[in-house]
Each structure stands twice: as C-alpha cells, then as structure tokens.
Amino acid sequence: GLQTSWFPMRHSENHGRLRRWSYLDKFGCQHGLFSGGQVYLLFLTVYLQEGCKREEMEDAMQIFHYGNLSASTVLIQPVDDHDLEEMETELNEIRKQGKADFQLIAVKVDNWNQDLSPWEASAVFGREGFGDGAGELLQFLLGQCADRRKTYYIGGYSLAGLFSLWAAYQTDIFAGVAAVSPSVWFPGFLQYMKEHDMRAKSVYLSLGNREERTRNPLMATVGDCIREGYNLLKMQKIRTILEWNPGNHFKDAGIRTAKGFAWLIRNQGAE
C-alpha cells in the first residue's frame, strides 16, 4: 500500500536554504517541527483554513509511505522524480531479495544540491553549486524515526547515497546504510570519513564499473574514493561490502538501490 504525506516548508531568500520545517495538521493549521499530525494528499482538497499561505503549499515536501506501515523494519530514502518512477521496481526487488517485511519511507527532495549536501562546494557541472542543507534535512528525517522499537535503515542513490553515508556519521539511529553509487567524489568527504567514526553497524557500498570513466576530473575520482572509503570502514570493524554493478551511473538505479536495502535486511542482527 501507499500513503502520502504533505509537509510544507518555508524557504528563506538565501539560495533556498531551509529556515525551518513546518507542516499542516488535518485541519490545515500550521505547526512547528514534529509537534502534531499529518495531512494526506487524498484529503488536500478539504479542511484548509485561513492563514495557511499558498507559498508554503507550493514549497511542500512530499513523503511517500510504501509497504507494511506496521513492519518493524523501516527504510528511509531521499528521492527525486526519477527514483519515484522506479519505486515499484525497487520495492519488488527488495521483497524478492530481502525476504522480510518492511516499510519504505520515501522523502522527495526538490532541491537536490542544496538539501543533500553536508557543506558548501563549488559547481562540478553546470552553474549550480552545492549548499549545506543536509543537517536540516537529517533533523526532519529523524522525526520519521520516533518509534525506537523499530529498526531504521537509510539509503539512497547518487548524492542521496552520499547524504545517507554522512547521516550515519551524525547519529546511531540508523542500524545500516545503503550508499548506492554515492557521490563520494564530493570535495572533502573522503577526508571526513578518515576523521570520523561510522555510527551505523552495517554499510552497503556499490558503484557501476564504468562510473569512474568520465571526463570530469573530480567525478573520475569516485572509484578510488569508494575503494578507500570501503577500506576505512573495514578498519573500523564495520560490517561492509563493496559491490560493483555493470554499467555507468545512470543504469538500473532502482534495482541497484534495492540490492543495497535487501543486503541490509538480510544481515539484520548479524554479528
């Protein structure tokens, strides 16, 4: 089953940096961070009271709930439109490979370079650089992990994979990480891994075997970076694997992500 929540956000004028998170309860009233209910998209057409600004509705973040909402295993995944298009494929593959009940919470991130970046960095391609919104996004995601009786995993593809890795250095709420084709070429991230301890017990890493064959000199370092990152995690006694997939960065994102989450589920509770 799929349930969808709507979480409006307010942005400041500074390059879309999130000033604070807010949402509407079922009657359309605005509240602060994590202080009450949710509104589902099925009911968006009703109960909007005066005082709920249209600009906040236009900036809304969507959260998609898949699978068994009462499952004890919860997968958290920042996604974009392409990830959502491949979600059914991903879910079916997780069910096939993971062989366990789960819920997947997909959080749609509209400003990819801003909200998934742990710190600011110059543009790698095009004109858009990277912001430092990862901290605020993480705080929001932690609000989805309130039931401590459940086991939470975080994962994502590309920059969302990098964010997921970084998030597991900040908190021990996540039992494992699926960093799938992660942007570990990100300036300063490998050094960050060297200087900090991973707080998750399990880390799945993967990369396409043609991803490092790119003309962009920074992105071409992704292979060396993920190999070194994998060795760093092994030195820290983290349960980890580095899997190589056929193809470049844009091949089979949904299936690759599913393989990562399924590996975490299969290894749940392993010593």
Please name every model-derived segment:
Residues F64-D147:
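Serine-hydrolase catalytic machinery in alpha/beta-hydrolase-like enzymes
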Residues G155-A160, S164:
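Gly/Ala-rich beta-loop-alpha elbow adjacent to hydrolase catalytic centers
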Residues I173-W185:
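A conserved short beta-strand
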Residues F7, F27-F34, Q38-V74, F102:
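A domain-start/cap signature at the N-terminus of enzymes
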Residues T257-E271:
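Catalytic active-site module of serine/aspartate enzymes centered on a nucleophile-bearing elbow/loop
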